[in-house]
Amino acid sequence: MAKYTRLRYDVTEVPLADLVREVMGEEDLEGLAASDRVATRETDQSTPYHRRFYDNVDVISPVYRTLVHRLLGDEVDAVYIQRIPTFRVHLRNSVAVGSWHRDRDFGHDPSEVNYWVPLTRAYGNNTLWIDEEPVHAEYGEVIVFDGANSWHGNVVNDTETSRVSMDFRTLPRSSYEPNDRKSISYGLPFRLGEYWDTV
């Protein structure tokens, strides 16, 4: 059985989905058009939806940081957070992440903790899988898991809805070691002020 913790937050106080709908210019995130091809590791971050999200990260960042404060509470001063959250779109007939992986296989520190934040319903084959188990979640829930060391990924979405989510990682400040390895999603070095930040 996959190991994870389920947290909840108030979506009226941290309206992430509303903000993402606004910056993407999309009324219905679950209704995003089906894909005509299955994404790969090289293409899973290159849809027009991703461009709109990352082009507006300065608008999203304050609400993202509010979420981090709500989730971490007093622990926020003991960790570094991923400066720019990773955006995921699991379109129908495609995948959100091009390959099953453990984050450590891509240069991430083994002591990192992953926070997966669905902005739509996540169920059936449109959801995140951890250690070969689908993790169902609703908007307003956050799944916390050991993505550095646990196999995770997804399968082709054969549901009737697209899934939109974001995720981020934390790193204990005591484990931080500056290095020049780069994140696979957007090529940022795993350094403070680049990939990592304080809240």
From Swiss-Prot:
Stored SUPFAM superfamilies: Clavaminate synthase-like
Recorded superkingdom: Bacteria
GO biological process, one term: streptomycin biosynthetic process
Function: May be involved in the formation of N-methyl-L-glucosamine.
Protein name: Streptomycin biosynthesis protein StrG
Alphabetic keyword roster: Antibiotic biosynthesis, Streptomycin biosynthesis
Pathway annotation from the record: Antibiotic biosynthesis; streptomycin biosynthesis
Keyword Iron-sulfur in annotation: no
UniProt source species: Streptomyces griseus
